[in-house]
């Protein structure tokens, strides 16, 4: 078995799917670790082509020989909630001004999509996490 490469850095970024380019914030974040920026951009864009329009978080592991691997996560819960509720952004004062509504089915669908990244044992616990995020954004969850 080949010896394990030594990890020199872990970079977490949220990038629009299929739209990675060497401009900030991607270029500087990768450049300071010595990663080939264009190589990452091409690989990321190819991997996220089918999810255009979503923000996809990525965790890039950089090794000492300047090679890298990356893991794609599911889109942030807030982004999925905004899309489902049809609002551009959450409320500035969430507990007084409500900006949208979500049904229990929509919350459950988002929870199923996010399940792999959430710290929840079952779909009901995941739904509660998503409902809490929605409430803190000023979006009402119908019972």
Swiss-Prot record:
InterPro entries: Ribosomal_uL11, Ribosomal_uL11_bac-typ, Ribosomal_uL11_C, Ribosomal_uL11_C_sf, Ribosomal_uL11_CS, Ribosomal_uL11_N, Ribosomal_uL11_N_sf. One of its GO terms (biological process) is translation. GO terms for molecular function: large ribosomal subunit rRNA binding; structural constituent of ribosome. One or more lysine residues are methylated. PROSITE patterns: RIBOSOMAL_L11. CDD domains: Ribosomal_L11 (cd00349). Gene3D superfamilies: Ribosomal protein L11, C-terminal domain, Ribosomal protein L11/L12, N-terminal domain. Pfam families: Ribosomal_L11, Ribosomal_L11_N. Keywords: Methylation, Ribonucleoprotein, Ribosomal protein, RNA-binding, rRNA-binding. Coiled coil: none annotated. GO terms for cellular component: cytosolic large ribosomal subunit. Part of the ribosomal stalk of the 50S ribosomal subunit. Interacts with L10 and the large rRNA to form the base of the stalk. L10 forms an elongated spine to which L12 dimers bind in a sequential fashion forming a multimeric L10(L12)X complex. Belongs to the universal ribosomal protein uL11 family. Forms part of the ribosomal stalk which helps the ribosome interact with GTP-bound translation factors. This is Large ribosomal subunit protein uL11. It comes from Leifsonia xyli subsp. xyli (strain CTCB07). The gene is rplK.
